[in-house]
Amino acid sequence: MRNLDFIDSFIPTEGKYIRVMDFYNSEYPFCIHAPSAPNGDIMTEICSRENNQYFIFFPTDDGRVIIANRHNGSVFTGEATSVVSDIYTGSPLQFFREVKRTMATYYLAIQNPESATDVRALEPHSHELPSRLYYTNNIENNSNILISNKEQIYLTLPSLPENEQYPKTPVLSGIDDIGPNQSEKSIIGSTLIPCIMVSDFISLGERMKTTPYYYVKHTQYWQSMWSALFPPGSKETKTEKSGITDTSQISMTDGINVSIGADFGLRFGNKTFGIKGGFTYDTKTQITNTSQLLIETTYTREYTNTENFPVRYTGYVLASEFTLHRSDGTQVNTIPWVALNDNYTTIARYPHFASEPLLGNTKIITDDQN
């Protein structure tokens, strides 16, 4: 769970809900003032609903947190002068930093995206109830901004599957053995992802209570492309595919706000941009270096058997499969998101001592942009 290790806050809040108090030793918590709406004011007051008082702090790569309410999943969002509760979009004004003041207290700070030097803290407008949260630049020696966490509800984080060795290349057992359609699958990596960043038919409010963290599993295997018995000295043209279908690319983007770049690296949207470092580290993937998305491409390639005896050849390409799971392990995307990477291909052969076929002309015949 590498992405959780990136927190530089002194308060380990990623594994529990906390009841956030407005300032040290206050009896009045933060709560969502209009819990039935997707957005609303964040107030310091006596709350009528318990869930409105509890928040989970989702950590990001750089140590900041996204503060989500247990009742409906809405998050702290900065506006011109105050902080409200709104739907998570990945806006810079939805990322806060916990800054330690004493062993028991801290304050929440937000960076003004228009100014690198403008750091503001959250402060109740007044000590009269109810009171909205406003920004203040008065940070030094200001006790009104101090917060303490109380009445914690511990979460059970999903158990991530153990990583496995990379998939082994299939081995042919005879001249008539075409090999398996797929090799055995290997789990390469997996990572936690907050429920506010994924798409599921379960309501966001229900997700916050039952599966606040999902996980994404990255699996690899060898996918068969073709198989043929090559007579001695024969040449054959074979059709091969690479990339990802447009349907899978769109579904993956909708499901986890992540897509696959043309270089097979991952491209992160606004919602997941803050966890891209931990995500790629955990799943053993890379961040894309291109703005172009991966497409599905069909090739024809010529192969020649240079041996003076018949050889069975079966061509394989490495497949990377991504699946989204709830905390109980239930898979959300019933059809996995699969990318075929033709930078990694192999040809199984029988007899085993035969040489690989000689590669001739390669021609792109279709891609999903045409």
From Swiss-Prot:
Q: Which InterPro entries match?
A: Ricin_B-like_lectins, Toxin_P42
BP GO annotations: sporulation resulting in formation of a cellular spore
CDD domains in the record, alphabetically? beta-trefoil_Ricin_BinAB
| Keywords, sorted A to Z | Disulfide bond, Sporulation, Toxin, Virulence
Query: Which Pfam families does the UniProt entry name for this protein?
Result: Toxin_10
Q: What is the effect of changing D22N?
A: Decreased heterodimer solubility at pH 10, 10-20 fold less toxic to C.quinquefasciatus 4th instar larvae
Per the record, the major location class is other
Post-translational events? Processed by proteases extracted from C.pipiens larval gut; 6 amino acids are removed from the N-terminus while it is estimated about 20 residues are removed from the C-terminus to yield the 40 kDa toxin form that is seen in insects. The 40 kDa form is 50-fold more lethal against tissue culture cells than the precursor form. Larval gut extracts of Aedes aegypti and Anopheles gambiae also generate the same 40 kDa form all of which are toxic in C.pipiens.
Start and end residues of each stretch annotated as Beta-trefoil domain: 1-155
Q: Could you say how this protein's activity is regulated? A: Toxic activity of the cleaved 40 kDa form of this subunit alone on cells of C.quinquefasciatus is decreased about 50% by chitobiose, chitotriose, N-acetylmuramic acid and N-acetylneuraminic acid.
Q: Which SUPFAM superfamilies match?
A: Ricin B-like lectins
Question: GO molecular function, one example?
Answer: toxin activity
- Oligomer status and interactors: Forms a heterodimer with BinB. Upon toxin crystal solubilization with NaOH at pH 12, only the 63-kDa (binB) and 43-kDa (binA) proteins were detected.
Function field: Component of a binary toxin active against Culex and some Aedes mosquito larvae; about 1000-fold more toxic against C.quinquefasciatus than A.aegypti. This subunit alone is active against C.quinquefasciatus, Anopheles gambiae, A.stephensi and Aedes aegypti mosquito cell lines; non Culex mosquitoes are less sensitive to the toxin. Binary toxin internalization into host gut cells requires both proteins.
> So what family is this one in?
Belongs to the toxin_10 family.
Q: What is this protein called?
A: Binary larvicide subunit BinA
What is the native source organism of this protein? Answer: Lysinibacillus sphaericus
Q: State the gene name recorded for this protein.
A: binA
